Amino acid sequence: MSNTIKMVVGLGNPGKEYEQTRHNAGFWFLDELAWKWKASFKEEKKFFGEVARAALPDGDVWLLKPATFMNRSGQAVAALAQFYKIKPEEILVVHDELDIPCGRIKFKLGGGNGGHNGLKDIQAKLGTADYYRLRLGIGHPGDRNLVVGYVLNKPSTEHRRQIDDAVAKSLQAIPDILAGKWEEATRFLHSK
């Protein structure tokens, strides 16, 4: 049986100055997944980002960290998906989520973009919202005028620990997600 997910995308912004910011939670997840799968990233200009191929027993899974900055993430996702003939429903996008308490996780297929510029661009470039999302809660600053500064700053030590715990828990659900066991993955990820 082959994997139902053929590409995992972590969203973030490239560059040292953004490395530890909340908006890069998707990159944090992907770095841990690549380490777990012993896959190495290398820059691929034709895919507008860093790409790693994980050779798994049930087939290859491509890992992608767009180097386009958040609001142009779709350019990288669409380039890799088109080249390897990966359908939107075979893509998992991992990203930070303001509307979920810090350290909580939500998993879903499709839906709105919640104002997330990375998701907006992916939807525009793929022509559909029907791809899977793993949403890592980073919490909300409480005032929409503070959002940009909030996502582009480092979390507190406590919040970073909560996000790291959410990443670790999410990694445990990846085998079910790859196997298409959506209900099992959702139940596990949504539990406290």
UniProtKB/Swiss-Prot annotation:
Gene Ontology CC: one annotated term: cytoplasm
Stretches of the chain forming a coiled coil according to its record: none
Top enzyme class: hydrolase
The protein, known as: Peptidyl-tRNA hydrolase
Major location category of this protein: cytoplasm
Active-site residues, Swiss-Prot/TrEMBL: 23
Keyword annotations from UniProtKB, A to Z: Cytoplasm, Hydrolase, RNA-binding, tRNA-binding
Record field: catalytic activity: an N-acyl-L-alpha-aminoacyl-tRNA + H2O = an N-acyl-L-amino acid + a tRNA + H(+)
Binding partners and assembly: Monomer.
Domain of life of the native organism: Bacteria
Annotated site location: Discriminates between blocked and unblocked aminoacyl-tRNA: 13
Location(s) in or outside the cell: Cytoplasm
Annotated function: Hydrolyzes ribosome-free peptidyl-tRNAs (with 1 or more amino acids incorporated), which drop off the ribosome during protein synthesis, or as a result of ribosome stalling.
EC number: 3.1.1.29
Matches recorded under Pfam families: Pept_tRNA_hydro (PF01195)
A single GO BP: protein quality control for misfolded or incompletely synthesized proteins
Source organism of this protein record: Neisseria meningitidis serogroup B (strain ATCC BAA-335 / MC58)
UniProt GO MF annotations: peptidyl-tRNA hydrolase activity; tRNA binding
UniProt: tRNA binding residues: 18, 69, 71, 117
Stabilizes the basic form of H active site to accept a proton, annotated site positions: 96
Family in the record: Belongs to the PTH family.
